[in-house]
Amino acid sequence: MKDIWSQQGRIALERDFWIAVMKAQRDLGVPIPAEAVKDYERVKGQIDLASIAKRERVTLHDVKARIEEFSDLAKRQFIHLGLTSRDLTENVEQLQILRSLKLVHFKAAAALLALAKQAELNRDLMITGRTHNVPAQPTTLGKRLAMFGEELLSAFTRLEELLNRYPVRGLKGAVGTQLDQLTLLGGDNGKVDQLESRVLKHLGFRASLSAVGQVYPRSLDFEVVTVLHQLGAAMASCATTLRLMAGAGLLTEGFQEGQVGSSAMPHKVNARNCERICGFGTILGGFVAMTTGLSGHQWNEGDVSCSVVRRVALPDSFFAIDGALETFITVMRQMEVFSAAIAAENERNLPFLATTTILMEAVKRGAGRETAHEAIKEHALAAAKALRSGSGDADLLARLAGDRRIGLGKKTLQAILSENVRFVGAAPHQVDAFLAEVHPLARKHRGAADYQPARLL
């Protein structure tokens, strides 16, 4: 990702673009000597950022400085024929975006496969499901991970859809009419279309905009950043829950040999990587706000008020999602689940976790739903208070068995609790459904299943 967005990398892309346009123009009849093309190709790798910056301090125009630099190196003046600055910058920036999206696409597939592996490993591990962060009903850890995985998969699908249709601006000139290329090519619309096709092929895009002005719609930038935010949001939600579980001692994101959790408290094992993922999500949300400010504010055929925002928001959005993906994959590979602690939490909460099942069994045996609901609520709240305060009757089962409104004896209630495996409902099958959607990604994206992220600091 760093290579795609580096200044050196961008200038290399620009020079390749100029040469591709020059070759196409020459093939279509523009009088450009073959030796001139070779001269540009010979020096295209000689990128002197200091020299370009020196020129820009004089011209106060970044593109003009880069034109002069490249032309002086080649000792020729055949690049940028019939082009405006935006013919260069828009197309090259969109190429950077396209390549970045493809890299994100691969790493998102790797993230989904890593998450799916954990979901499969923990398919049947019953945990205490929580709503409002309060014990609710049993689920499985695999289902919890699949829940967040499904959100990530939805974002991944949206990313694929965007990649399949993302259009490039193309060579459209100062206001989008292609006037200068038409003039250069003798007014031949067919040749202009051929030039456009050659540029499209060089850049690797499937489609170009046909009626665009000087700039492509900035709502496209918004669409790009929002899909990155959606990917980040799914990972951040998962990371938030892993942080909560780590705080309860139910799992760890991984703790490496020699790692220190706190400079003051030697015992600390913090979920620092999960916290980092959440931080990246916040950053991406900020860039969504920035690109929102660009959408719907184009003046006529275009202006450059968007430039300063885009120079920050676009590369940094990709750096943020790249960091989030690298960190998320690392967490999925290194996390360790403490099944004994999970079992202890289940045992502590089990009578309360079974209340909806008890309610349904009571209704099946003829109890009125609202009557039984009120009775179970009264006993559950009283038992919970007694349990937490250390005084009073905390035996929820005995309380329920003694209430005629519910109509279930102690043996029946004990039998219900003994079948606690069924309390997770369809969770294992839902995990299987998620896995069936994700596993094909390993075939479609070779290397994604085995992708090893860089070592995190």
What are these regions (language model features)?
Residues S197-Q214:
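A short, charged helix-loop
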Residues E120-G142, T252-K268, E301-V309, R333-L353:
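Glycine-rich cofactor-pocket loops
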Residues V215-L250, G254, Q259-A320:
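A conserved active-site cap/scaffold subdomain adjacent to cofactor or substrate pockets
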